[in-house]
Amino acid sequence: MLNIFNLICIFFNSTLFSSTFLVAKLPEAYAFLNPIVDVMPVIPLFFLLLAFVWQAAVSFR
């Protein structure tokens, strides 16, 4: 339980500190990747939601 709590704290700390980097811009050569880079911080939340959906599918055994 403590390990899960630590991972959650690390995740929230990294998202808080990574928000300071939102003012940075990608180089022009990589400008087409801007939409993907904008979505990347949300990807770990998709895995969290996937875990709940998976457990609901197997009836929380």
UniProtKB/Swiss-Prot annotation:
InterPro entries: PSII_PsbK (IPR003687), PSII_PsbK_sf (IPR037270). One of the components of the core complex of photosystem II (PSII). PSII is a light-driven water:plastoquinone oxidoreductase that uses light energy to abstract electrons from H(2)O, generating O(2) and a proton gradient subsequently used for ATP formation. It consists of a core antenna complex that captures photons, and an electron transfer chain that converts photonic excitation into a charge separation. PSII is composed of 1 copy each of membrane proteins PsbA, PsbB, PsbC, PsbD, PsbE, PsbF, PsbH, PsbI, PsbJ, PsbK, PsbL, PsbM, PsbT, PsbX, PsbY, PsbZ, Psb30/Ycf12, at least 3 peripheral proteins of the oxygen-evolving complex and a large number of cofactors. It forms dimeric complexes. Keywords: Chloroplast, Membrane, Photosynthesis, Photosystem II, Plastid, Reaction center, Thylakoid, Transmembrane, Transmembrane helix. SUPFAM superfamilies: Photosystem II reaction center protein K, PsbK. GO terms for cellular component: chloroplast thylakoid membrane; photosystem II reaction center. NCBIfam families: PRK02553.1. The keyword Chloroplast applies. It is a single-pass membrane protein. This is Photosystem II reaction center protein K. Residues 1-24 form a propeptide. Pfam families: PsbK. The chain crosses the membrane at residues 40-60. The keyword Chloroplast applies. It comes from the Eukaryota.
